């Protein structure tokens, strides 16, 4: 059966390449620091960006966390290498999945280059079935984003309308401010933070021939009080059956096991894989409501595919039956009831790291509820948030205004940037579309004329 193994241990970090003059200035306060950065530094917890690791080992001053970054500029101007030693199951089908690389990284496994990541907003995945050994070594060579930006193609027509940092698919506030007289970037760092490194989980995904590769699960609440569970899926191999289980005995609401059910289907199998598209009628499902209007009833959906009676792959998601209507701009009715939005705009919780911080996020949700907020805007110039953030919004009834990661005016009209943005949008929609808390999609922040 398909399973995922996160690589949390066995990681270390070192600086690579030549050091620019400004970088050495940043290290001048301690001669031993420069020497230590040429050696491997053990990473205690993953994911962790370079700034997280150096601070934890006492290689960055305390003032860095307060926003004074002069002594940390060398991080964004340097190349960095992550190394991970891990044990694998040789002979099994396996992919390696990176769910957060910041940003330009060449990836090597056992001396073989797997490829390069150049987009902060996209996961990277490689099939390593033929390379995986019992004992393995993974290297991630992160290229300086400052140097990479300066090397990108630039067209004269962009002068005056496009910021140069937009040739890199990374948050624009991670780069030096173009108007240096301001003294800091938008998020308050002086002069700026440039996070680099691994900000999301790295996992081995062991899989079978029969596999789920894409899914679209939608719960609709009809006007008559009944519900429809819509399922579209596709995958590889030749599974015999696909079985859908659903119940409402989750964390929120009262026990409603009598509303659950199960149904099996035979997928449409072709030479290039399989697919299925079905609708299941659900009698009077408990409805999902935004905070302050009712319970956040969630249905747990477990879908399995089998071959010769063996479960080969499955997905587990929580969904909510609700109906959203917008009769005029921003006049929303949910499940037939008028809902007034009380919102806040969510900025990244930290400037110096893009790693998700569950404790800080829980505190944020407490503040949101204390402020009587029922809607959060995910800022287009911010960073992607993991599934657990949206799961928490589902549980708490917090509606989401989701922006695509674009903002602050025009972008280069190059084929490379267009292709990245298209892939980002497709990935984000596929990942989030089943969440009942998702209220609307927005094209970005402050870029109607040039986005």
What are these regions (language model features)?
Residues 1-376, 395:
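Secreted/periplasmic carbohydrate-active enzymes, especially glycoside hydrolases
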Residues 323-451:
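Substrate-binding cleft of carbohydrate-active enzyme catalytic domains
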């Amino acid at each position: 059966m398909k399973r995922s193994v996160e690589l949390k241990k066995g990681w270390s970090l070192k600086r690579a390449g030549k050091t620019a003059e400004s970088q050495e200035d940043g290290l001048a306060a301690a001669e031993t620091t420069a020497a230590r950065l040429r050696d491997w530094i053990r990473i205690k917890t993953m994911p962790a960006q370079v700034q997280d690791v150096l601070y934890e080992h006492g290689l960055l001053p305390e003032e860095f966390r307060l926003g004074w970054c002069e002594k940390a500029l060398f991080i964004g101007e340097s190349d960095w290498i992550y190394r991970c030693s891990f044990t694998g199951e040789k002979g099994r089908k396996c992919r390696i999945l990176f769910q957060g690389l910041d940003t330009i990284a060449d990836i090597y496994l056992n001396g073989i280059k797997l490829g390069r990541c150049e987009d902060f907003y996209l996961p990277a995945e490689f099939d390593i079935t033929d390379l995986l050994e019992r004992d393995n070594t993974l290297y991630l060579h992160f290229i300086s984003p400052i140097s990479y930006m300066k090397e990108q193609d630039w067209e004269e027509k962009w002068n005056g309308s496009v910021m140069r940092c937009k040739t890199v698919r990374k948050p624009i506030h991670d780069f030096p401010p173009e108007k240096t007289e301001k003294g800091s970037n938008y998020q308050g760092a002086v002069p700026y933070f440039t996070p680099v490194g691994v900000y999301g989980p790295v996992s081995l995904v062991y899989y079978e021939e029969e596999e789920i590769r894409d899914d679209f699960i939608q719960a609709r609440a009809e006007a008559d009080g009944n519900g429809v569970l819509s399922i579209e899926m596709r995958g590889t191999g030749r599974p015999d059956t696909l079985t859908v289980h659903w119940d409402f005995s989750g964390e929120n609401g009262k026990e409603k096991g009598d509303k659950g059910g199960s149904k099996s289907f035979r997928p449409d199998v072709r030479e290039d894989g399989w697919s299925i598209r079905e609708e299941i009628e659900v009698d009077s499902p408990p409805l999902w409501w935004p905070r302050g209007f009712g319970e956040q009833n969630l249905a747990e959906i477990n879908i399995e595919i089998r071959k010769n009676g063996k479960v080969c792959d499955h997905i587990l998601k929580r969904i909510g039956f609700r109906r959203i209507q917008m009769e005029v701009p921003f006049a929303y009715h949910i499940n037939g009831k008028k809902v007034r939005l009380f919102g806040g705009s969510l900025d990244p919780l930290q400037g110096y790291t893009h790693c998700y911080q569950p404790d800080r996020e829980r505190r944020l949700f407490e503040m949101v509820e204390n402020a009587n907020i029922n809607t959060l805007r995910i800022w287009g110039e911010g960073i992607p948030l993991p599934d657990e953030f949206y799961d928490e919004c589902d549980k708490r009834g917090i509606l989401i205004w989701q922006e695509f990661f674009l903002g602050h005016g025009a972008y280069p009209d190059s084929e490379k940037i267009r292709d990245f943005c298209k892939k980002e949008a497709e990935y984000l929609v596929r990942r989030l579309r089943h969440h009942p808390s998702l209220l609307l999609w927005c094209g970005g922040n402050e870029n109607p004329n040039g986005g």
